[in-house]
Design a protein with these regions (language model features):
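Flexible, small-/acidic-enriched active-site or ligand-binding loops
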Residues: 52, 161, 231-280
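A structural signal for well-ordered alpha-helical segments within the folded catalytic domains
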Residues: 63-70, 146-149, 188, 260-263
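A glycine-rich dinucleotide-binding beta-alpha-beta segment and adjacent secondary-structure elements
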Residues: 196-252
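Aromatic-enriched alpha-helical interface/lid elements that frame and gate functional surfaces
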Residues: 126-201
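Non-catalytic accessory regions
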Residues: 277-290
Length: 290
């Protein structure tokens, strides 16, 4: 896996996280493909900087990791089926093209890509953030027709009439109508009334990221974090396994320290103990002391 593919003048060039994000458009898409055209004051610059950093952080490398994992699994599957291994070539540009597949190709009659609104609240009136009473927020996610119907039925049961037809529209009138409904109660009320009934609506501002990973009941029930011991830092919580094949989480270790496995790797490729010790003494290889 590299940045620019196996051939051509860029094959040996390094590539870092922001490059494919910028070239493939994923970062700008997260911002609604909007950038200010006028000179900004300091508060506005801070807002746009925050948006840019958040849009970039979750894009190019995670997209590439998804494609690397999928490609490795496909290769292993092919090996298992055919008995033959094969070389798999992946690059960051291609990986991010896959992640932006809904807008990477252009053809006559192609439907436009769903775009975030100017305030970056969401993609559609039925898939966005809404402010509620007590300065709280919910995220509503009812993209399918059956989900819209369930949402409308639940509102009716709460004494709030809503025409299901408007939920299919993508306009400010629908946003305004739903905004007025959600402002009537706080986020805790809406989550309690809608989520247990199968309506995708949850409070969106309950925790900061750190508090979420440490204290959210859903995180704990899914074992999304796991305690471990780092040789330098001591006991800490790390993320749990992203994929499990059973009822329990595997035991996960901390990340390796710098050079931790250098001696093992050199031994695997034929270096004897004396040669490895000499490389360490010369400073050719180095390992971090715990």
């Amino acid at each position: 896996m590299n940045g620019y593919g196996p051939d051509g003048p860029g094959a040996q060039r390094p590539s870092t996280h922001p490059i494919p994000g910028a070239a493939m458009g994923g970062v700008l898409y997260q911002m609604g493909e909007r950038m200010p055209e006028q000179q900004q004051d300091i508060p506005a610059l801070r807002t746009w900087t925050r948006r840019l950093m958040r849009a970039n952080e979750l894009n190019p490398d995670p997209n590439t990791a998804m494609v690397v994992c999928s490609s490795a699994l496909l290769g292993l599957n092919a090996l298992q089926r055919t008995g033959k291994g094969q070389r798999i070539l992946i690059d960051m540009f291609g990986a991010n093209a896959y992640a932006n597949h809904d807008d990477f190709l252009s053809y006559p009659g192609k439907a436009p890509r769903a775009m975030p609104d100017e305030g970056l609240h969401g993609l559609h009136p039925s898939y966005r953030l809404y402010a509620t009473a007590e300065d709280q927020w919910v995220f509503l996610a009812v993209p399918e027709e059956k989900e819209k119907k369930r949402f409308a039925e639940r509102l009716t049961a709460l004494g709030i009439e809503v025409d299901i037809a408007i939920l299919t529209r993508n306009d400010e009138t629908t946003v305004g109508h739903l905004s007025e409904i959600f402002k009537g109660k706080n986020a805790e009320f809406w989550e309690a009334q809608l989520a247990p009934q199968g309506v995708g609506c949850v409070r969106a501002d309950r925790y900061s990221p750190v508090e979420f990973w440490w204290h959210d009941p859903q995180v704990q029930s899914l074992n999304l974090t796991q305690p471990t011991e780092h040789p330098a830092w001591g006991a800490y919580d790390r993320h749990g396994a992203n994929v499990t094949f059973g009822r329990s989480q595997p035991t996960l270790k901390p990340p390796p320290t710098a050079g931790q496995h250098a001696e093992e790797l050199l031994a695997e490729i034929g270096y004897d103990s004396a040669s490895i010790a000499k490389l360490l003494a010369q400073g050719t290889i180095w390992k971090e002391q715990a």
